[in-house]
């Protein structure tokens, strides 16, 4: 290694630092998805079954979302009903 190479500003990042950065992005993404409760998919499935007793709908016609605002949690339920 040359003495001038040591002081160069345009060094390429090492593969280890690139791998570390990518892993941090993946971990942050996984943590973001864990914020939804485990019961949400089963709740959506059961809601579809109950609504199907009265109205003909598909699995994609019911959307369930849970939002947290401070100490309050809001369960949002959107149902697309067919035209009569």
Curated annotation (Swiss-Prot):
Native organism: Pseudomonas fluorescens (strain Pf0-1)
InterPro entries per the UniProt record, alphabetical: MinE, MinE_sf
Pfam families: MinE
Gene3D superfamilies membership: Cell division topological specificity factor MinE
HAMAP family, A to Z: MinE
Function: Prevents the cell division inhibition by proteins MinC and MinD at internal division sites while permitting inhibition at polar sites. This ensures cell division at the proper site by restricting the formation of a division septum at the midpoint of the long axis of the cell.
Keywords: Cell cycle, Cell division
Signal peptide feature range: none
GO annotation, biological process: cell division; regulation of division septum assembly
Record's protein name: Cell division topological specificity factor
Family of this protein: Belongs to the MinE family.
UniProt keyword annotation of Cell division present: yes
């Amino acid at each position: 290694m040359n003495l001038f190479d040591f002081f160069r500003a345009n060094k390429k990042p090492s593969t280890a630092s690139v791998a570390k950065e990518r892993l941090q992005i993946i971990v942050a993404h996984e943590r973001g998805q864990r914020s939804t409760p485990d019961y949400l998919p089963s709740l959506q499935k059961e809601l579809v079954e109950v609504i199907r007793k009265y109205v003909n709908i598909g699995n994609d016609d019911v959307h369930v979302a849970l939002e947290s605002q401070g100490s309050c949690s809001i369960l949002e339920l959107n149902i697309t009903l067919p035209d009569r």
